[in-house]
């Protein structure tokens, strides 16, 4: 096992530059003669040789309000019917326990997909009108938090 050799070409030798003409990479170290690429540092990203760069030629445009956008975790009445019993409270913590929402969503919106047959008391951020009427018809309660 310790006498195994690497296949040919698997381990490349490191380039040692600037160590005399006999090495093949002496004097200019494989960088050619003069010019920007022969110098020590390369120009910064977006630099176009002194010409006004593209990012300054084009106007700034647009606006995004995504950082302040409210995102709701959507829960359907059918899902609540499957996971909850009569008289139970449906809020952020109980929905999290039953894995109907993920942790990152703090706001909950209830939609009317599916059938609700159990009386539950909802403590949510938002609820659709049809979902609200279905919950009230059964005799459940709604508290907007």
UniProtKB/Swiss-Prot annotation:
The alphabetized UniProt keywords are:
Ribonucleoprotein, Ribosomal protein, RNA-binding, rRNA-binding
Q: Which GO terms describe its molecular function?
A: rRNA binding; structural constituent of ribosome
Task: Show the InterPro entries listed in the entry.
Answer: Ribosomal_uL15, Ribosomal_uL15/eL18, Ribosomal_uL15/eL18_sf, Ribosomal_uL15_bac-type, Ribosomal_uL15_CS
Q: Where is this region: Disordered?
A: 1-58
Q: Name one GO cellular component term.
A: cytosolic large ribosomal subunit
Composition bias of kind Gly residues appears in: 19-33
Task: Report the record's Gene Ontology biological process terms.
Answer: translation
Function as written in the Swiss-Prot or TrEMBL entry: Binds to the 23S rRNA.
State the oligomer form and interacting partners.
Answer: Part of the 50S ribosomal subunit.
Q: Which family does it belong to?
A: Belongs to the universal ribosomal protein uL15 family.
Q: Which protein are we looking at?
A: Large ribosomal subunit protein uL15
Q: Write the gene name.
A: rplO
